[in-house]
Every structure is written in C-alpha cells, then in structure tokens.
C-alpha cells in the first residue's frame, strides 16, 4: 500500500516544505573530535510531514511468475533472499521495474540489455520503499540498483525550498567512489532536472558549499567533509528520506563508524535506508541492525567471501627480493597486449612513490596515486589512466575500492594486502560488469597468515591453486584447504585444464629466468592456436610456436631486432646485455648514455631485450620534455602535461 503524503512533484509544487530554512546556525568548529557539536535529534513522527516511498507497481509478466519460476530465476542468478516480510518477485527486464521513460531512454542509450542479478531483486525492493541490505561482488551494478529508485523517489517528493538539504544522501568511503557515483547520478538525473553534488575532503570547500546552498536533490559525500558541513551549518538533513550507505564494510575498515552514526542521527527515523557491501562481517551486521528497520537482505553469489568469477587469479609464491624481477617480466608481456591497462597495488605510500620512480626511470609509462596526493593531482592521474596515456597505475588501497575504470584488464598485487577482503576488492578493479580480467599476486612467506583465507577465495572461484601455496599452509600446520586442496593435488594436468593452465602460467612467469624464449601474450584465456600448440607438444617456447620470430616480435635466438619489430633502434642483444648499445638506438629511445648505466641498477627491464611495443608506442616525440618533475630522477621523455589547476581560495 502506498503511504499518504505528497504524491507526484508536478502535482504538488505549491505544497509546503520540510521545516525551518537555513541550517543549524552553529559556529564553525576548529578543534575537537569530528561531529562533537552535532547532537542526536529527538524526532516526533507525528509532527513530521508525511512522505511517500512505495512506488512499485508489479509488471504483469512478473506477476504471472509462479513460486517455482521465482525460485528457479533466483537460483540461476545466484540470488539469496533473507529476512523481512514477503519479498517482491525479481524482475528480469528493465521495463518490468516501470521506470519513467526518461530513465529508460538513458538505459537504452547506454546499450544495457538486461539488469544484473543485484538489480533484478534490488529494483523491486528499493522501489517498494523497504529497507534493504545488498551483498554483492564489486562491479555488480549496485550503483544503478540504488540510484534509479532514488530518482523515482525524489520525483514523488515536493520541490526543494531555499535552505533545504538533499532528499537523497549517498555516503561513500573514498572521494574516487563518490565522484563516480555523482557521474552516474548526472547521467540519469539530468533528464528529470535533478541536481546532484559531490562533497569530499582534499578539495576546495567553496564550490561544494555553493552547490549545497543552491539546493541539490542528491548529495554524494564522504563522511568527514559532510560532518564538517553539518557542524558549520552549511547544509542539513531534515529533508533526507532516502539514505544509501555504499561500501559499508570499507567505511568501517577506514574507521568512519562514529561519523556515520553522527550523520544518521540527523536523519528522520522513518527514512528508507539501503546498505551495500561486498562482505558481511559482524561489524556490518551490527550497523544494519542499528540503522535499518525490518530489512531484507539480498545476496548475490556465495555467502562467504567471494571474488568475481570472471577474473583469472594467478598466485606466484616468491621471495621479497624476487618481486622486482618478476614484475618486469610480467609487465613486458602485458605491454605486448593490445588492451594492457594495469593497476599495481602496493602496501605503503613510500613504496608507491619509489616503485613509480624506478619504473618511469626505465621507460615504463607509470603513474601513481595514494592518500598524500592532492586532489587536482589525483584527478589528473586518473584522467591520464582512463584515457590510456599512462596505462600503468601504481596505487595503495586508496584505489582498491570504488575506482571504476571499465577497461582495466590486469591487476597486480605487488604486495599482498592485510586481509582477504582487501584482496577481493583489489582484484575487483578488473572484470567490471560482464568483462573478463586477470589478477596476479606475489605471495611471500611473510604473508603466511593470509594463506588459508586466500586458498578459500581461490577455491570458491574455481581457480587453480599454486602447489607452493599449499605447501606453505602444510608447513605451517595444515588446514584451510579442505577438499579442494586434495582435489588439485591428485588430479593430473591432462584431466584438469585449470591446473594445466596454472602450470603454463607458472612456466611463463619464470620468463627468461630458465633461458627460454620470451612470450608476448598475456596469461588470459587461450585461443585455438594456443590450445593446438600445447596439444601437439610444441608449447609456447617451441620454434614452431605461434609466438616465434614473427614480424612485430623480437628474435632472441638471433640476438638482434629487426627494423619492423623495433623501429629504428636496431641494437643487438649482446649490446643491450653489456649496456653498450649504440648512440642511434639511444637517441631513438630518448635516453642518454649516462641513463643507460643506471638502467640496470634499479627495476630495469629483465636480462632480455626491451619490449618492442614499448619503444613504438612511447617513443619520444620531437621537442618533448620531461613529463613530471616531481620524480626526482631522469624520467623517460613524454610530452608535457597541462598543469593541474591551482586550488581556489576557500
């Protein structure tokens, strides 16, 4: 039943607003704990204006589904429903949700054909005004699952008046995620003249305050900056009736629980609340119990910690000292791919800067992002990465959640994270939506405590498990592997294509270490040529292999580059190994003879010749100058970028 209230905005533009205007009038806070000036409001529901939040009309095709068909649809899409009263039937097409035509037009323009599993069940729940918890892997389409119902919700509320705060509030853990959500909100809200803003720390307050003062229906915010604005009276949440907690587990990991509780205390208790998370630990469960009323939990996939099944996960057990050499071998193969956008995750800001400096010194088109970077610099780096001008992004966990770049094909965990939850979110930066991707992980004995959890994640995703990883667990005292562990041990490669693939990946990770020819493909799904090569015994290193001395590939056996393979820099393998290649090749690669002597002391290329595609794609243009001066090293030559805009005065 629809609750009584204002109904459609077009019918009620003359109705009254939601209380006093202008904000709280509190003086700005300069010291103390965030949110200490905010007091929990005492709400009297009988005095609050009524509002409508149930707008769901079941489509006839959905209404005709029998209970058996509903169960079968949920089973096929791996949807599990728990709690609440009777849950609405899932939809299986966008038009079943009865969205307004302007929303359907945008969906069609973006070539969406059918809703994702989380959207199939999330749309009916959110449109019916119910509180809900959505548990799904990254890249599952949860942003649309709450934003499209939010647009419908807003358009059934009275118009904002001067001094009113937002109707829909989305809390996000990072500024990157907040910016991405706002972009989606702009794409779908502009057709209905809805305004949105994104407020986050690290950026000037002035433009954000002006947006709030002009009035926005949708506010996407990080907790810290929103607390600041609430305390200083720059905005209020009296009009907020639709609350979204996006990536709730991540916000708790980052220590935002006190701020979240302060913020929620400012919102009327009969609001509609939607919580989204990739994991379901006890801390998130407690938050749901405190903030949600009679909620329904929907889960897509396994209830345990799970990774995206579209990601091929490869774990290389190695020593800490081997990481640099293995990384360069890996990057040479990745950069030979047509689609090679890669994120490399490291543990600390210092290592992030150091690794970026060393890779750029040796010619890799790498840039970095971490929490100490200014907002203009972060925005510029992400734009360069998205555009493909710098296809290698080195990052700390600041980018492991919320960073949505559709065409990231590879993720490399240079340092294994502190928890399996962070591992799942890191590798979730690839294989967004229905795409496929590959994740490589360097796992050292120092990460032994996480071995069991990693094995569980691999087994759940039906991935092959590196025997060295199993040996680490056995050496520590067994356990954790379960039945899956014995299965991979006892099954032969001939009968287990997944394990055969893993064996081949291990062989290729070794690269030139064993003296074999370098390959120029990635470790992704095999083509028909690959399978035939493997089946007839030629393998990837055979003279008859598909990756032999062809045009566009270098010929290691002869030790010389052809002109077609390496442009004008035709120096020999012997010259490269000795560091004495000629001046002509040095000029074409944009390096000096002095920098060549430095090349082999850092994270330079492996003992093989440089990757040919790198010189073709990233050769120095005429008149180029250093790209970035902050590296503190002689950098590879690029066209100078436009400087980031100077921060405006607050």
Curated annotation (Swiss-Prot):
* Comp. bias intervals (Pro residues): 638-650
A Gene Ontology biological process annotation?
miRNA metabolic process
Q: Where is this cross-link: Glycyl lysine isopeptide (Lys-Gly) (interchain with G-Cter in SUMO2)?
A: 50, 449
Q: Where is this region: Disordered?
A: 1-38, 472-543, 583-650
Q: Where is this region: Transactivation domain?
A: 468-650
Q: Which SUPFAM superfamilies does this entry report, sorted A to Z?
A: P-loop containing nucleoside triphosphate hydrolases
Q: What does the UniProt keyword field contain? A: Acetylation, Antiviral defense, ATP-binding, Cytoplasm, Helicase, Hydrolase, Immunity, Isopeptide bond, Methylation, mRNA processing, mRNA splicing, Nucleotide-binding, Nucleus, Phosphoprotein, RNA-binding, RNA-mediated gene silencing, rRNA processing, Transcription, Transcription regulation, Ubl conjugation
What ranges does the record give for the region Interaction with YAP1, renumbered to this chain? 639-647
> Where does this protein have compositionally biased stretches of type Polar residues?
489-499, 610-619
Record's subcellular location: Nucleus; Nucleus, Nucleolus; Cytoplasm, Cytosol
Q: Where is this motif: Q motif?
A: 92-120
Glycyl lysine isopeptide (Lys-Gly) (interchain with G-Cter in SUMO1) crosslink site(s): 50
Look up the domain of life of the source: Eukaryota
Q: What is this protein called?
A: Probable ATP-dependent RNA helicase DDX17
Its source organism is Mus musculus
